[in-house]
UniProtKB/Swiss-Prot annotation:
InterPro entries: IF-2B-related, IF-M1Pi, IF_2B-like_C, Initiation_fac_2B_a/b/d, M1Pi_N, NagB/RpiA_transferase-like. It catalyses: 5-(methylsulfanyl)-alpha-D-ribose 1-phosphate = 5-(methylsulfanyl)-D-ribulose 1-phosphate. Substrate binds at residues 58-60, 101, 204, 255-256. Its EC number is 5.3.1.23. This is Methylthioribose-1-phosphate isomerase. Coiled coil: none annotated. The active site is at 245 (proton donor). The record marks 165 as: Transition state stabilizer. It comes from Xanthomonas axonopodis pv. citri (strain 306).
C-alpha cells in the first residue's frame, strides 16, 4: 500500500482557486462551475469582500487566504510611516472583510495574523504583510497534505465514504481538507467508493466536489441530500468525512447546513464521522456551538435552481447556511497537529491549549 510520500500530487493537487499576480487577486469563480471556468479579478479589498460574500470564493481556509490578500490590496490606498500607523488606517477595510462571512473563524484568524504583523512592522510594513499573506496560503497547503495522510490512516482498506459540501482544492490553498483525506485514501487504495451529497441550496457537492474528483480521475457517485440515511443503512459507506468552518473548545463543529443530520444518521447506523480542518479553524475562545453566530442568507436562494424559479410566489423560506454538530457525535477531528479522537473539552485543551 502506498504511503503519503508517494501521492502523485501532480494528479491529485492541480486545482487552484486563488492566484496572487502581484497586482491583483484572481479568483476562480465558483458560482459558474462546472459549466464555465471563469475568473474574478479583485483590484481592491472591497472587491475581495464582495467576492467572499457572493460565494465567488468559498470554503473557510480559502476565504481566510483571500482576506489576507485583501489587506495587501487595501494597503495601496493609504500612506503610513510604519505598520502601527498603517493598521489604524486599514482597520475599516479589515472590518469590512471580516463582515463578509461571519461564521467561518478562518476569516477572523487570517485578519488577526495580518493585524499582528502590521502592529510590529517598521517602514517595510508593505513587504511584511505581503509575506504574511503568502505564508497563510503556503501553510494551508502544507497542512492539507499532512491532514490527508493523518485522516487516510484511520480508514480501513476497501471502505466507502460519504462527503458533504466542498472541502477540496476549491475551498483551500490546494488538495483540500476532507477531500484531501479522500484523495490520499484513494491514492493509498484505502477508499473503494466515494459518495457526495448534492448540498442544497448552492449545490456545492453537485457542482464542485464531483467536478473536482472527476478532474482527478476519481469516480464519485452523487446522491440527493435526502438519500444519505438510506445510503448508510445499505452498508456502502463506513465513514462520513466533512470539513468545518469553526470548531469550538468542546469539539462542537459548525459546518455546511446538513452536516448535523449526517452525524445523527451516522451514529444511528454505526458509521464513523470524521471532521477535517486546519488548526486555524479551531476556536478555543468559543466554549460551545451555542455561541456561534449562524449566517442566514437570502431566502430567495431556496426558490429555484440555476436561476429558474421552482417555488410558487408568496412562499416563505428559512435559509441558515451552517449548523452545529455536537462534539459527542464526532469520532475524530483531524488537524495538522494530529487526530483528536472522541473530542471533548479535555482532549481539545490538551491539543490546542485553553
Amino acid at each position: 500500500m502506498n504511503d503519503s510520500a508517494h501521492i502523485d500530487y501532480a494528479r491529485y493537487d492541480h486545482i487552484r482557486p486563488l492566484l496572487w499576480t502581484g497586482d491583483a487577486l484572481e479568483l476562480l469563480d465558483q458560482r459558474k462551475l462546472p459549466f464555465e471556468v471563469a475568473h474574478v479579478r479583485c483590484d481592491s479589498s472591497d472587491a475581495v469582500a464582495e467576492a467572499i460574500h457572493s460565494l465567488a470564493v468559498r470554503g473557510a481556509p480559502a476565504i481566510g487566504i483571500a482576506a489576507g490578500w485583501g489587506v495587501v490590496l487595501a494597503a495601496r490606498d493609504i500612506a503610513a510611516d510604519d505598520g502601527s500607523a498603517a493598521l489604524q488606517k486599514l482597520e475599516p477595510a479589515l472590518l469590512r472583510l471580516n463582515a463578509a462571512r461571519p461564521t467561518a473563524v478562518n476569516l477572523a484568524w487570517a485578519l488577526m495574523r495580518m493585524r499582528r504583523v502590521l502592529g510590529a512592522a517598521g517602514a517595510d510594513w508593505r513587504e511584511v504583510i505581503a509575506r504574511e499573506a503568502q505564508a497563510i496560503a503556503d501553510e494551508d497547503l502544507a497542512a492539507n497534505r499532512h491532514m490527508g495522510a493523518l485522516g487516510a490512516a484511520l480508514i480501513a482498506p476497501g471502505s466507502g465514504v460519504l462527503t458533504h459540501c466542498n472541502t477540496g482544492s476549491l475551498a483551500t490553498a490546494g488538495f483540500g481538507t476532507a477531500l484531501g483525506v479522500i484523495r490520499a485514501g484513494m491514492a493509498q487504495q484505502r477508499i473503494a467508493k466515494v459518495f457526495a451529497g448534492e448540498t442544497r441550496p448552492w449545490l456545492q457537492g453537485a457542482r464542485l466536489t464531483v467536478w473536482e474528483l472527476h478532474q482527478d480521475g476519481i469516480d464519485a457517485t452523487l446522491i440527493a441530500d435526502s438519500a444519505a440515511s438510506h445510503l448508510m443503512k445499505s452498508g456502502l459507506v463506513q465513514w462520513v468525512i466533512v470539513g468545518a468552518d469553526r470548531i469550538c473548545a468542546n469539539g462542537d463543529t459548525a459546518n455546511k447546513i446538513g452536516t448535523y443530520q449526517l452525524a445523527i444518521a451516522a451514529r444511528h447506523h454505526g458509521v464513523k464521522f470524521m471532521v477535517v480542518a486546519p488548526s486555524s479553524t479551531v476556536d478555543m475562545a468559543t466554549a460551545s456551538g451555542d455561541q456561534i453566530e449562524i449566517e442566514q442568507r437570502d431566502p430567495g436562494e431556496l426558490f429555484g435552481v440555476g436561476g429558474v424559479r421552482t417555488v410558487a410566489d408568496g412562499i416563505h423560506a428559512w435559509n441558515p447556511v451552517f449548523d452545529v454538530t455536537p462534539g459527542d457525535l464526532i469520532d475524530a477531528i483531524v488537524t495538522e497537529r494530529g487526530v483528536i479522537a472522541q473530542p471533548d473539552l479535555a482532549r481539545m485543551q490538551a491539543a490546542f491549549g485553553s
